[in-house]
Amino acid sequence: MNIFEELKARGLVFQTTDEQALVKALTEGQVSYYTGYDPTADSLHLGHLVAILTSRRLQLAGHKPYALVGGATGLIGDPSFKDAERSLQTKETVLEWSDKIKGQLSTFLDFENGDNKAELVNNYDWFSQISFIDFLRDVGKYFTVNYMMSKDSVKKRIETGISYTEFAYQIMQGYDFYELNDKHNVTLQIGGSDQWGNMTAGTELLRKKADKTGHVMTVPLITDSTGKKFGKSEGNAVWLDADKTSPYEMYQFWLNVMDDDAVRFLKIFTFLSLDEIAEIETQFNAARHERLAQKTLAREVVTLVHGEEAYKQALNITEQLFAGNIKNLSANELKQGLSNVPNYHVQSEDSLNLVDMLVTAGISPSKRQAREDVQNGAIYINGDRVQDLDYQLSNDDKIDDQLTVIRRGKKKYAVLTY
């Protein structure tokens, strides 16, 4: 099975400009290719991971990746299938975000070894050197307004309005392809299926300005089995930065993937062989309640993104919280595992009587209910049941001198911080 056949078997090929020519190029020699990442935030997220891992698969097959950080295009904003104009960021912010994204990409691509080691480029380096007049004369003249307006990504915005700034975005992305082809012999661009219009602007410019053929391959935008856009948890993006989405939160995200999606996602998001995945699928279908596919997915992706130690920690947090063994976890581990539960910062004037604190921290709705909860054995401090109405919280209840975990019943948690 050649690399293109494997990508197809994994469900990673959505569209290509000329499949036969692309397969020929990929099987006959080394292809230089690029994927672009606009710094629209200070971190990449799961939505980017499909293209990143596809790029890594091609590198493992001997081809040479260029990772383009859009320091210039990030200043403009991509209108593709967006309902409204993006807010423009300052140059300083975009350049700072660009540096962070560069660091994240080095986790996945090999920038050190071999003749196909990855290269990092930033389109701010060339766009900052081109005058507006030169850009219009040397690039803009190759694009008709009719051609630009025919793009689906632009059509959707015509009625609601699109600025010239965003309208020109596709020409800038097209010029990226031309520049990388001219300087580095890059002949293939990879990106999400929503980028098709912008990406083919590059092949158009190559054809008209340099009489060369470029290839485009899009990867699918991933949705779950209900059709919902994939990569968000409770409406929030799942970030690759551990400070924005902890390894534990990412682990839980994958653990909660629906059965109908789990095997498909193993093909897309892991480097397990297709034979290994087929074996997992057989075992998974025989005992779905054991969630083997989800557990494997969580292990593989968290290890890939954050490393084996982070995976082991996420697994330990999961197991200890499930068993109620709060004291077996550090304060930092508890912050990860209980990041979504109510948090109350204890004030110096607060009463440390347990009944009072249950009401103050919002764990019990009233003192009467709080007393009943304590007497009925429904209150746990750091996993230990407390039934003393006169119990006073003390330093002994602080884990690592930072926090106390109170549980009411089986599932209602609150974290007291000091």
Swiss-Prot record:
SUPFAM superfamilies: Alpha-L RNA-binding motif, Nucleotidylyl transferase. A motif ('KMSKS' region) lies at residues 229-233. Keywords: Aminoacyl-tRNA synthetase, ATP-binding, Cytoplasm, Ligase, Nucleotide-binding, Protein biosynthesis, RNA-binding. Its main location: cytoplasm. It is found in: Cytoplasm. A motif ('HIGH' region) lies at residues 39-48. Its EC number is 6.1.1.1. Residues 352-418 form the S4 RNA-binding domain. ATP binds at residue 232. CDD domains: S4 (cd00165), TyrRS_core (cd00805). It is an enzyme of class 6 (ligase). L-tyrosine binds at residues 34, 169, 173. One of its GO terms (molecular function) is tyrosine-tRNA ligase activity. It catalyses: tRNA(Tyr) + L-tyrosine + ATP = L-tyrosyl-tRNA(Tyr) + AMP + diphosphate + H(+). Catalyzes the attachment of tyrosine to tRNA(Tyr) in a two-step reaction: tyrosine is first activated by ATP to form Tyr-AMP and then transferred to the acceptor end of tRNA(Tyr). NCBIfam families: tyrS (TIGR00234). Belongs to the class-I aminoacyl-tRNA synthetase family. TyrS type 1 subfamily. This is Tyrosine--tRNA ligase.
